[in-house]
């Protein structure tokens, strides 16, 4: 019941099975919850090995998860006291549409009334949160997966249009890219023996995309578009100059 999974029994063999397995397969939230629950149970069963099973530290903000979920379910606005890393503390009202996990951080995406637009809010930068009595209507045309469909990471700019991005990946890193794609739109369009492979994407050119490509360093080469290739080249030269 916790995961919305129906378990039934085959009376002929007395075997239990998940009757809604196809539904579970297509529901990423339930998959994530069930996997987390399974891992938690395995670790609890092997408590004597807890010092040998290491996890990344999750930032603060998880204490607000239940409040955000309640607000989403009841369609109530949130009053938030917020302080971003590079800005001033402010109080605003948010209509929560969806939530997303990225790089071990929780984000809530919704309509920020004071700025009259959809924004992403990091839960670990929230100082205080209050569930208000003010209701809102979730737009019929808002689809969380579609909202993030052409972006790497959390940053979305409505003014940007997706472009064809081609990245050449070298050596053994090709296998890493195949097993852990940069984005779900990834397609391998060319392979040159074991030397390199070209991967194509449909992406908006966001700062997070640039950062991830830079992080791959000499393992990759941006082929298209020319503007992104030039941006990566300039940033790499700037990094080299730091060491002169």
Q: Predicted regions: what is each one?
A:
Residues 1:
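DNA-recognition element of transcription regulators
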Residues 105-109:
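Short aromatic-glycine-enriched beta-strand elements
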């Amino acid at each position: 019941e916790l995961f919305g999974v129906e378990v039934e029994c085959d009376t002929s063999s007395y075997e239990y099975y998940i009757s809604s397995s196809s539904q579970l397969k297509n529901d990423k939230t339930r998959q994530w919850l069930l996997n987390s629950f399974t891992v938690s149970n395995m670790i609890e069963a092997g408590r004597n090995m807890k010092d040998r099973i290491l996890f990344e530290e999750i930032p603060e903000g998880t204490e607000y998860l239940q409040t955000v979920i309640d607000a989403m379910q009841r369609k109530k606005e949130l009053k938030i006291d917020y302080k971003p890393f590079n800005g001033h503390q402010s109080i605003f009202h948010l209509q929560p549409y969806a939530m997303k996990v990225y790089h071990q951080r929780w984000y809530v995406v919704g309509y920020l009334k004071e700025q009259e637009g959809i924004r992403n809010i990091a839960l670990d930068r929230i100082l205080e949160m209050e569930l208000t009595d003010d209701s809102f209507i979730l737009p019929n045309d808002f689809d969380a997966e579609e909202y993030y469909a052409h972006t790497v990471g959390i940053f979305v700019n409505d003014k940007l249009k997706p472009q064809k991005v081609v990245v050449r990946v070298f050596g053994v890193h090709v296998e890493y890219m195949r097993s852990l794609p940069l984005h779900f739109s990834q397609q391998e369009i060319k392979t040159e023996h074991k030397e390199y492979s070209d991967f194509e994407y449909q992406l908006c050119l966001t700062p997070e995309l640039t950062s991830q490509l830079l992080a791959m360093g000499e393992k990759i080469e941006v082929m298209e578009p020319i503007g992104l290739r030039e941006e990566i080249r300039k940033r790499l030269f700037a990094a080299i100059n730091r060491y002169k």
